[in-house]
Curated annotation (Swiss-Prot):
This is Protein SprT-like. It comes from Streptococcus pneumoniae (strain JJA). GO terms for molecular function: zinc ion binding. Its main location: cytoplasm. Keywords: Cytoplasm, Metal-binding, Zinc. One of its GO terms (biological process) is response to stress.
Length: 149
């Protein structure tokens, strides 16, 4: 899919206005589907959203960013808090928030247990069991499950 052509097509079909600036993929975007840059008018999109959530969701994200784009160049309120933005987004059926991506928070938890009092600890990061002990009874910690990395 040619991204620039697709965004121009969505702009004409859903807004009736041309899109004349630059569009690009940005793999560094993590928690957002796209970004609008008022300074030069270009748009960035997250390729993972397109790959993992499909074209229907991606089209709604393109509409969201085009709402920012067209309202900014019309001199209207283009920020999320503005009424103009909310009304236009509703009219074109754009997404307000990106659905969470699968595997976005998939870091497995490590489970430790105190050998004395059986207190359990879940951690994202590894604990040095030679250096750290249980916070309740000062007993030794034991790694129960080692997830595959």
């Amino acid at each position: 899919m040619k991204l620039t052509d697709y965004v121009k097509q969505v702009s004409l079909e859903d807004f009736g206005r041309p899109f004349i600036h630059h569009v690009q993929w940005n793999r560094r975007l993590r928690s957002t589907g796209g970004r609008f840059f008022p300074k030069d008018g270009h748009l960035d999109f997250n390729p993972k959203v397109y790959q993992e959530l499909g074209l229907d969701v991606f089209r709604k994200i393109v509409r969201h960013e085009l709402c920012h784009y067209h309202l900014y160049f019309q001199g209207k309120g283009y920020q999320h808090k503005d009424r103009d933005f909310k009304e236009l987004l509703k009219a074109v059926d754009g997404l307000r928030f990106v659905p969470s991506l699968p595997n976005s928070n998939s870091k497995p938890l490590k489970l430790y247990r105190c050998q004395s009092c059986q207190q359990r600890y879940q951690r994202k990061r590894r604990i040095d069991t030679k250096r750290y002990r249980c916070g309740l009874c000062r007993g030794k910690l034991l790694l129960i499950n080692q997830p595959e990395d």
